[in-house]
Regions:
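Amphipathic alpha-helical assembly/interaction segments
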Residues: 1-168
Length: 168
C-alpha cells in the first residue's frame, strides 16, 4: 500500500498514541518534581512521531532512513525513562499505564525497524527521484522478475531432474 500522507502511516499513528499516552502519564504528581524527567520524557516520546513525519516528507529514501533511525532511538529513550520511573516506589499506582506505554514504545520500535529494513532493500531512491522513466524501469524490472519466477516454477515441473529440491 502506498501512503500519500504521514498521518495515514500505521507506525506514525502508533507513535502519536505513544506521545499522547506519555503526556497523560506525566500529568501525575510524581512527575511534578524538580528536574527534567517530565520534559525529557515528553520530548523523547513526541520526537518519535515528529521524526517519522519529517523523514516521510523529505522525499528521498536515504533521508527517510536517517529520520527513522532517529525516531527509533527516541523510542528507546522513551522506554528507558519509563523503566527508570518504574524503579521508584512513588509511581506504583502508574504501573499498568507505564507497562502499556513500554509495550507501545516497543511496538513502535519494531514497526520502524521493519520499515527501515524494507527500505534498505529497495531499489527506489525515494519519491523525489521518481519520474515516469524510473517508474517504468522499476515496473519493467518487477514484471521481469515475476516472469522469471513463473518460468522457473514451470520448468521445475516439466524438468525436475534439472533442478535440485527447493530448500525449506
Amino acid at each position: 500500500m502506498k501512503y500519500e500522507r504521514f498521518e495515514d502511516l500505521p507506525v506514525w499513528q502508533t507513535a502519536i498514541e505513544l506521545a499522547v499516552g506519555v503526556y497523560n502519564l506525566t500529568r501525575d504528581r510524581f512527575y511534578n518534581q524538580p528536574g527534567d524527567l517530565r520534559s525529557q520524557l515528553r520530548r523523547a516520546s513526541l520526537s518519535v512521531s515528529n521524526n517519522i513525519a519529517e523523514g516521510f516528507e523529505r522525499g528521498s529514501t536515504a533521508e527517510l532512513l536517517a529520520f527513522l533511525y532517529i525516531a527509533r532511538g527516541s523510542c528507546g529513550e522513551t522506554r528507558s525513562m519509563l523503566l527508570f520511573t518504574e524503579r521508584f516506589p512513588e509511581p506504583a499506582h502508574l504501573k499498568s499505564e507505564i507497562s502499556n506505554l513500554k509495550s507501545l514504545a516497543e511496538s513502535c520500535s519494531r514497526q520502524i525497524r521493519a520499515w527501515a529494513d524494507s527500505l534498505q532493500n529497495s531499489d527506489i531512491k525515494g519519491q523525489r527521484h521518481l519520474n515516469d522513466k524510473t517508474r517504468d524501469i522499476y515496473q519493467a524490472r518487477k514484471r521481469s522478475e515475476a516472469f522469471e519466477k513463473q518460468l522457473e516454477e514451470m520448468l521445475r515441473k516439466v524438468c525436475p531432474q534439472d533442478y535440485p529440491p527447493e530448500e525449506q
